[in-house]
Every structure is written in C-alpha cells, then in structure tokens.
Amino acid sequence: MADTYVGAIDQGTTGTRFMVFDHGGHVVANSYERHEQIYPKPGWVEHDPTEIWENTEQVVTDALDSGGIDASQLEAIGITNQRETTLIWDAESGRPVHNALVWQDRRTTDRVEELEEAGKADAIRAKTGLQPDAYFAATKAEWLLDNAEPLKLAGSRASDLRDRARDGELLVGTVDSWLIYNLTGNHVTDVTNASRTMLYDIHEMAWDDELLEEFDVPEAMLPEVRPSSDEEFYGHTDPDGFLGAEVPVAGALGDQQAALFGQTCFDEGDAKNTYGTGSFYLMNTGEEAVESDHGLLTTVGFQMSGEPVQYALEGSIFVTGAAIEWLEDVDLITNAAQTAELARSVDSTDGVYMVPAFTGLGAPHWDGRARGTIVGMTRGTRKEHIVRATLESIAYQTRDIAEAMEADSGAETTTLRVDGGAVKNDFLCQLQADILQTEIARPEVDETTALGSAYAAGLAVGYWDTIDELRDNWQIDREFDPEMSDAEADRMYGRWDDAVERSLDWATEE
C-alpha cells in the first residue's frame, strides 16, 4: 500500500482543499483555493457553484502534481462539505439556476417565524432533530424555487420552475451532491448531509412527504441518500475527465460529522469541537437519537455500509473563526496569529464582553435576529481588550454547548477533542480548558475534517480494514489541562449571559 493513497475533497465555507492521505493517516499532498463570498444584501450570503467546482478541479490537479502522484494511485476519493449550503441546477446542462445560498444566509428568517407562529416547529423537530431555522436547507430550497432567475434557464418561465423540478429536470442538493454530480454524473447525498436539510426524517431515514409538501420541494429533484462510507460507491470519476482516471467516489460526510469521524469518535460519549468559521460541538450518542431539551440538535453522526446509523447531539455556533476574520476586517489585527500575543498582553478584558452574533445565534439560543454586540467598554478600553474578549467569546459559546450537552446526555465530558484552524492558537486552547474546566486534546493531524472523509472512503474500498486501524492512527499533539480555578471560570462566565441578552432580537427590520 506504500504507493497508493486516498484523496479527500474538503469544500468549506471560505475555500476548497484537496488532501491526499497515506495508510498512516499522514498528509502527503495538499492544495487550497479560496472562493468569493457574495453578500447581495445584509444577512444574505451566497457562493458561485461554478467557481466552487472549478476550484475543486484546480486543487485536485495541483495537489497531485505537487505530490508527484498519479490519479491512478488514488484508491478512492471522499468528500466533506460545508453543510446546509443549498443549490439547484439543471440536470441536463449542469448549470446552476442561481448562486448557492450559504448556511449563514438569513433571508428566510421570516419563513421560519411563520412556521413557529403556525405551531409547526415541534413537529418538524420531532422528525428531523432540528430546531427550525434559516440555517437549514429546506427554506433555502423553497426560496430558490420561488425566486431563482429564470433567464438562467434557457427557454423556461419563472412559473414553471417547480414543474421542471417535478419532472426531474432540476436537481437540488447540498454541496456534497453538487460535487458528486460533477465527479460521477450521479445525484447522491449521504445520511449526514440529508439530516441537515429539514426535509429528512432521521428516525425513518427517508425524505418526509409532509415536509416536502410544506416547503413545496418535489421529491424528484432530491438526491438518493446513501451511507457515509459506501461499499457500493456513489460512482466513479470519468477516465476521460480532468483526472484522467476512474477513481471510486465512496465516502461523504458533512464537515462536522467528518471531523467526528476523523477524530475517531466512534463510541457513545465521544465528543469533539471543530473551530472553523463557526464552531460545532458533537457528541456520539450511539444508535439512539437523543432528543434535546436544551437547544441542541439531534443529527446523524455517520453510517457505514450495512451497519446501523450512529446519531449525535450537536451544538452549532455560527461565528467563532469568523469573529477573528472580523478583527482583521476592521484592522484591529493584521493576521489571526496576532490574537494570542495581543490577548496575553492584558490580564483581562477589563469587563468587556463581545458577542459575535453577526449572523444570529445558534445553539442553545436560536435567535436569527441577534446581532454582534460589544458591551462593557470604557474610555480605557484598548484593542487588546477587544481581541481578548473575542477569544473569550469562543470559549464562552463552547461552554454554553458543553453545559447543554451534559444536561441532555447525562454524561460529563472529561476530555474534549478539538480541531480546526483556530486550535493552532495555544492561548485559545488553554483558555478553552480553563473556561470549560475540562482537558482539551489537540491531535497531530488537525485537518480532521478532510481526514474523516478520507477514512470513510478508504474503509469503503478496503484501504483500511477496520476502525481500530483508524484509532491507532489518532495521535495527540498536545493536551491542555485547566489552570484556572472553578470559581474564577464561573465568575468570568457569569456575565456572559448578560452580554448575550443584550444581543438578542436586534435585527427587527430585516
């Protein structure tokens, strides 16, 4: 196996990466390309699907070239993707009918409030495990069918979008489906991505007729739902296409479930938190779909071929790494690495709290109209205090989730496995250990999202035989133990709720 590998396409919110892994789970080739963030109106966020696909072709080609690897040496390709981001495309031409609506997009908040006012939220939550929110795909698909620009569909009229969809001439999907379609020609998604649409019954493991009717999304346009690691494969790449080889596409997971898989959280009670644009804290709950009483989501964790679905509890935090990007945008820092130095330069925030609710608040608050807030400033407040408060906000939001997770599951997390770009920041990792009063374990391979999708694909084709091999690959880079007292952590966390309260229900005019 020394000369064969597994590739992973990691299509994220800000860019697309292709990583090639060897049997030991080590990265042997890597390429990354950013794509444009499109903001047509306040609260609206879009991506160009064509740009995403072109970037995917580019990073796959560049990574293989840089690693001196021929595409024929890839035993399989796995896919992981920004979840909930939704697009519709023409089945014959492959042309998107509109930009993709990104998971952060809030344009359907009014529609979600209609559902809540009509008393439908509990029924939706019971079937899907999801708190109705503009975050998920259902209202995005509905909006696209109502509003997609008809001029992008040659010869069609605005009124016939749903007719064409019912006839299977239009396809809808999350980004994994878009990539699988372009790679293989097949319309497929996996169970984890399906579970994020708000159209899928996670108990029956099927598209739900009542939800499809509620959002008027024809079933004919939906992808086939398959296991996350699929021994029957989703399809093969075209040997006459850009890769020049026929490679099985055999695994897919939404990015947060991929990180759960990559962190080898295969057992009930295992938990991880990924710090990316947002942060997503998942705990494996085994074969039981645990219902949350504390604002968490019940979701599909993963499924391997021929095996039962593994469920998870999830706390979705919409803005963490994006708050660091905001500090750059407003010139408080010049790069993300600078945050640790600035935060260490002051002993505290001097009472400043920052709530980074730029796109509303996710778990456990679920307020789509919350907005970013800084409170507690005085004339003596400096940028160092605001930078430190921003890092602390990441730790506080994570504690919100950890407390809800323990309340719902009845299990206390003794070690939290962390990954994502922000965990390279030792100050943040130590701060997180202190605020949670929990050990933080950072793995050697921190690109666990890509690694998880590679593992799923590799298991499907027999590159790895068992999940025990994957457990053996997982190695700790560093552990962070709490250095702060319980009392001090509680004191700092104590005013966080007050700050959050001031951010709620702000964007009343949107």
Task: Indicate where each model-derived feature is located.
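N-terminal glycine/serine-rich phosphate-binding loop of ATP-dependent small-molecule kinases
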Residues: M1-H98, A126, D240-P248, L436-I440, ...
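Active-site core segments that coordinate phosphate-bearing ligands/cofactors
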Residues: V6-I9, T109, L115-T128, Y135-T189, ...
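Short secondary-structure junction motifs
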Residues: G15, A71-L74, D167, A220, ...
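Short glycine-rich loop/turn motifs
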Residues: G15, R83, L222, L297, ...
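Residue-level signal for inorganic ion chemistry
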Residues: G25, D48, I77, D105, ...
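A short, local hydrophobic-aromatic micro-motif
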Residues: V28-A29, E75, L222-R226, A250, ...
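Short beta-strand-loop/turn "lid" adjacent to the catalytic site in phosphate-handling enzymes
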Residues: D65-W103, T128-A137, I180-D201, R226, ...
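Short linear loop/turn motifs
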Residues: L222-E232, A340-S345
